[in-house]
């Protein structure tokens, strides 16, 4: 499997945030989403061209950034965020994957 783009990670990330009581970190999301999506070790080792960050971790981070801008996630403190009421309302509508 290839590493999904950040748009494809938005709903799984929001769903993960919605199942947690309280805040999450990108590292927690990376670990859980990698398992849920069935990514291989090779997929997880893939690095950005700069060689400074994993491609998957980067894309999970961008998915979180854009969902924060949309008001679906909110930062709670540095490196932590949680689902908002708006995010919970969206999940309750059962959006298509």
Sequence positions of predicted segments:
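Short, solvent-exposed beta-strand-terminating loops
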Residues: 25-37
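Positively charged, polyanion-binding regions of nucleic-acid-associated proteins
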Residues: 1-27
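Minor-groove-contacting beta-hairpin "wing" of winged helix-turn-helix DNA-binding domains
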Residues: 79-84
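A short, conserved structural fragment
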Residues: 68-78
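Short, amphipathic alpha-helical interaction segments positioned at domain boundaries
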Residues: 86-97
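Short amphipathic alpha-helical elements of helix-turn-helix/winged-helix folds
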Residues: 12-20, 32, 63, 90
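Short helix-capping/hinge SLiMs at alpha-helix to coil transitions
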Residues: 18-21, 35-39, 76-77
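Short, positively charged loop/turn segments that connect secondary-structure elements
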Residues: 2-4, 34-60
């Amino acid at each position: 499997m290839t590493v999904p783009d950040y748009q494809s990670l938005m709903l799984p990330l929001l769903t993960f945030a919605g199942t947690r009581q309280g805040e999450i970190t990108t590292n927690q999301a990376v670990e859980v989403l990698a398992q849920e999506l069935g990514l291989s070790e090779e997929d997880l080792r893939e690095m950005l061209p700069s060689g400074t960050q994993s491609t998957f971790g980067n894309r999970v981070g961008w998915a979180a950034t854009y969902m924060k801008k949309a008001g679906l996630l909110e930062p709670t403190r540095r490196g932590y965020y949680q689902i908002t009421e708006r995010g919970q309302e969206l999940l309750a509508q059962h959006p298509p994957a």
